[in-house]
Amino acid sequence: RGLGDVYKRQAHALMDKIITATLSYLKMQIEKGVDVLQLFDSWAGILPPDEYQTFVLPYLKRLIEPLASKIPFILFARGITSSLLPQLSRLGVQALGLDWSIDPGWAQQALPGVTLQGNLDPSYLLSSPDVIVKKTRKMLSLFTDCPYIANLGHGILPQTPVEHAQIFIDTVQSFS
């Protein structure tokens, strides 16, 4: 944050190097046989929308365009403002991951036909089994008007008991 204001040219040069290296790495992943790519932008929410549009969106486009036609591509931008989600959906990705701050009803209305993934707060997996089941079922019941991939709204926390992750998986698989 702030790098682009003071060192705009250098910030763009840095992003260019990052995207070039990442693109090369992801192409190797495809060559080695991955079935899907998922890009996590865990710091997306730290930038104001105008800076995200300047310093991130053009580079995401450069990264996604040559790959999304070859392999399914999921983009997850944690903390992204709702005003930017429709722009992300137009980058050519096959699905958008949502964190727990995005309202599922709003997302389905704003992004018709877009496959959505998420958005259970990972901290719920630290709760009791009853809470995990309840929160997971609630999440699943809210994603009814779109193609959907059940998942957490960010990465699993290191201290999450394996048994609790299994409860989440079992709840998703048994939901109807």
Regions found by a protein language model. Give the residues of each.
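Short, small-residue-biased leader/transition segments that mark boundaries at the very start
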Residues: 2-7
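Surface-exposed cleft-lining segments at the edges of enzyme active sites
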Residues: 8-18, 45-50
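Active-site-proximal loop/short-helix segments
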Residues: 1, 30-55
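Catalytic-face loop-and-helix region of soluble metabolic enzyme cores
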Residues: 68-176
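Glycine-rich anion/phosphate-binding loops
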Residues: 11-24, 127-134
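Charged helix-capping and loop-helix junction motifs
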Residues: 52-59, 131-135
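Alpha/beta enzyme core
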Residues: 9, 19-37, 57, 61, ...
